[in-house]
């Protein structure tokens, strides 16, 4: 979300390696970061992930066990503090409506045949349009990482094996005498698999 929306506050939080949910809570609730409570952070986490999936005030209210007006207020505060996110969501809906699909940063397309339908079907397509560039780009990145890691294993002639991928994690089986080498190099390989373009915010 931070990369695609190019929202200044979100990008800054990631650059500073901050706890993104705590940083969001501080912005939404108008607190210093060290004053954010566990409940504040919990609410911010639900908002962060919920908005990625196009969660409505009704959905947020149900998820948090609060009133719809209170939930709407949280969402409004979030967009006020992170205007780039709101702009990204609006521009993505418009793009999907215009061309009938969205793309990941790497050009993989999700076609949205329901984007010109009415009611709930269109709403679902709009949610998919907002979410797909984020989730899809993350999926592309982890696949590129798997390819790079396997190539490195083969080039080094290691006995380590790539066993499983879960979300943004790679599970490996590593002989004891290769543990230090893998621990040192795996993060570097995954971090350097590609450089996301930064000159086209909002364009996938």
How would you describe each model-predicted region?
Residues 1-204:
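Conserved catalytic core of nucleotide polymerization and phosphodiester-bond processing enzymes
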């Amino acid at each position: 979300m931070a990369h695609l929306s190019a929202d200044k506050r979100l990008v800054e939080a990631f650059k500073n390696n901050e706890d993104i949910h705590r940083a969001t809570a501080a912005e939404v609730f108008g607190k210093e970061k060290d004053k954010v409570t566990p409940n504040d952070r919990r609410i911010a986490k639900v908002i962060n992930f919920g908005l990625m999936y196009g969660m409505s005030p009704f959905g947020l209210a149900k998820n948090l066990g609060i009133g719809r007006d209170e939930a709407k207020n949280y969402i409004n505060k979030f967009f006020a503090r992170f205007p780039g996110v709101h702009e990204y969501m609006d521009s993505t809906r418009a793009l999907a409506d215009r061309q009938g699909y969205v793309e990941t940063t790497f050009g993989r397309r999700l076609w949205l045949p329901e984007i010109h339908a009415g009611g709930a079907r269109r709403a679902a397509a709009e949610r998919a349009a907002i979410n797909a560039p984020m989730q899809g780009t993350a999926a592309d990145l982890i696949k590129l990482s798997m390819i790079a890691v396997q190539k490195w294993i083969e080039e080094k002639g290691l006995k380590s094996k790539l066993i499983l991928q879960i979300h943004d994690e790679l599970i490996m089986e590593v002989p004891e005498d290769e543990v230090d080498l893998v621990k040192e190099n795996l993060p570097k390989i995954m971090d350097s698999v590609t450089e996301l373009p930064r000159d086209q915010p909002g364009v996938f």
